[in-house]
């Protein structure tokens, strides 16, 4: 599959996942909020779903390359065994350049892996034979698991977790990034031809700690809402917001 074709398919898939993931929460909140006026337009109403495949994908994942608990190879094998069709590994500040020779930044890995008993562990990758087997699905009825290239979670040392996931372009490796700075990685990824999403904004805004859903519409959050809206409008390659990560 050509790179541009796959990017278009993934763009469509990402947008669909985020839209349908948001609907239950929006309706649940709207049911108890009488003073909020909004309309939801389904951009996929005319899609003939009978002619499109349905794929099980995971696009935001970590390993011991950054702050994950499991080895790089184990993460891949686990998703494959669970029947996934598409996988991206997006370790903090470290571009996924290969599933056979994992890329890692030792100083960054040590800093982010402080929770682990052994903060630095050299990640292990797949053998070339196993990589070929997984991506072709030769031991799974021909249903291979597609690797999304160059996955990374940008701004690894941001003090308020202003993180941005990106794919398809080799950007951000070893770059510490800035606190509250979503725009720099989004802009640079777009310039290189990649795709991105804004991650778990509730960690940045503090809204994840609100127990009352109605307070999500408090004017105190207008600044953040406008900030994200501007980024999404200005950079078409930023496809949306990963709102469900870590309980947001």
Where are these regions (language model features)?
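Bacterial N-terminal signal peptides that target proteins for export
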Residues: 2-13
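A generic local structural motif
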Residues: 4-5, 43-44, 73-75, 225-229
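Hydrophobic alpha-helical transmembrane signal-anchor segments
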Residues: 14-19
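Structural recognition of alpha->loop->beta junctions
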Residues: 214-247
């Amino acid at each position: 599959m050509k790179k541009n074709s796959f990017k278009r398919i993934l763009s469509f898939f990402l947008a669909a996942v985020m839209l349908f993931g948001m609907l239950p929460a929006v309706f649940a909140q709207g049911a108890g909020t009488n003073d909020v006026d909004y309309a939801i337009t389904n951009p996929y109403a005319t899609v003939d779903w009978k002619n499109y495949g349905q794929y099980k994908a995971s696009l935001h994942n970590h390993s011991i390359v950054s702050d994950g608990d499991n080895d790089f190879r184990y993460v891949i094998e686990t998703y494959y065994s669970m029947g996934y069709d598409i996988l991206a590994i997006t370790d903090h500040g470290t571009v996924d350049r290969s599933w056979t020779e994992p890329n890692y930044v030792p100083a960054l890995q040590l800093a982010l892996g402080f929770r682990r008993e052994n903060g630095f562990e050299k990640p292990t990758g797949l053998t070339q034979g196993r990589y070929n087997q997984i991506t072709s699905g030769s031991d799974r009825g021909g249903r291979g698991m597609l690797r999304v290239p160059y996955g990374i979670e940008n701004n690894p040392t941001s003090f308020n977790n202003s993180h941005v996931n990106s794919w398809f372009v080799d950007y951000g490796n070893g770059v510490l990034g800035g606190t509250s700075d979503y725009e720099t990685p989004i802009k640079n990824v777009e310039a290189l031809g990649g795709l991105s999403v804004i991650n778990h904004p509730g960690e940045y805004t503090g809204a994840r700690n609100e127990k009352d859903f109605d307070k999500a519409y408090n004017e105190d959050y207008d600044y953040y809402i406008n900030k994200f809206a501007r980024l999404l409008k200005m950079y078409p390659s930023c496809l949306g917001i990963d709102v469900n990560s870590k309980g947001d």
